[in-house]
Structure formats: C-alpha cells, structure tokens
Amino acid sequence: MSREKKLSALGKSMGKQMIRSWEAPQFSLFSVVNCKNLIRYRNLLPVKMSYTTILVKTLADTLAEYPILNSSWDDGSKIIEHEEVNMGIAVDTKRGLLVPVIREAEKKSLEEIHEAMTGIKEKSWNGSFNMEELSGGTFILSNLGMLNISAFTAIVNAPNAAILSVGKMKDEPLVQDGEIVVGKTMTLCLNMDHRVIDGAAGAKFLTALVQRLEEIGR
C-alpha cells in the first residue's frame, strides 16, 4: 500500500535548489590518495580528530592557492572569486541533508577547525542549525566514507563552482619500491561547473590536494 509523504518547507526548498544546480554543465575528476602518511599524522596528533577535520584544513589551504575553485557563477554576467573559504560540510540529520558552514576556514588552525567540527557533530543529531549557520558557503565537502561508500559524485550546489566527494579508506595493492604491498587508499571526486572551471584548472587543484594529503606531516 502506498502512502503520501508531504514535503516540508526545507524539502521543497532543497528540491528547487537541486533543479537549479543540475542545470549547470558539470564534469568530474577522480584521484586516489595513498593514506599512509595521513594515517600516521592523525595517530600522532595530541587530540583525537576525525579525518574529515584534517580534510577540511588541507582542503581550505589548497583552495586558498587555487581561488577559481572557490568561486561562484553569477547568472552569466560574471564569475566571483571569493577571498574567504567558507567551507560547507554536508551532514545527515533528522531534518535530512544539511550543509553547515565553517567560515574563513583558510584562516583557522587545525584545532579551531576541530572545535567547529565538534559543534557541527553535536548539532547534527537533531539538525538544530540556524539559517546563518547554513548560508554563505563557497565550497562543499561531502564525506560518505563512514557509510562504507567507496566513491561517488555529488551535484555542485549552485552558485558554487565545485564540490569534493570523499569515499572510504580501503585496502588496495600498491607498488612500493618495485614491490606490491597492501596499503590504505581513498578516492576523491571533484565535481565542477564547466562554465567556471576547465579541466586543466581542476586537475591542477586536485593534484595539489592529493599531494598535500600524501605528504602531510613530513
């Protein structure tokens, strides 16, 4: 037996926003991260932090060097490169998908981002974010690794120019010093609005991000 489920105001708003976002010509780039140094770096931190926290910090630092990825499409008249990296974090809540924003993430230390992520986690249980906390994002990070997803693409949230999707860490065969060893890897997918970002710019950014993650703590 079927039953109707009326959309909430939030659901209606999200539906309209997804249609608007899907109208943008989007493309994807994938890259795999060798997580050996990332795991070691996290284990050596004096305070236990999530991988998402470390990703936010590394991503914000990389976006500051590649501002075209931290841009917005302004309805065909201009492209806006944002000075601040206002990082949206896609989270699952009782109210559905919400994207709280860490403002000026590029200026924050790892400890400050950890504090912000702790606050987001606490509010995610019941979705008790206010509109100010959910607005003004310039780039979104979506991590489904904890839900056992290996890799996925995400829709760029208009007017943003890009979104990064992160899959789970998994064991894979790797070539090291001419030998095959088992190592931890994770797949990153960068989805972009092709009106703002071309393939070369996206590739340079994603390569720089992967390099930062693989060399972290050195």
What label would you give each PLM region?
Residues 1-218:
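C-terminal catalytic/motor cores of large multi-domain enzyme assemblies
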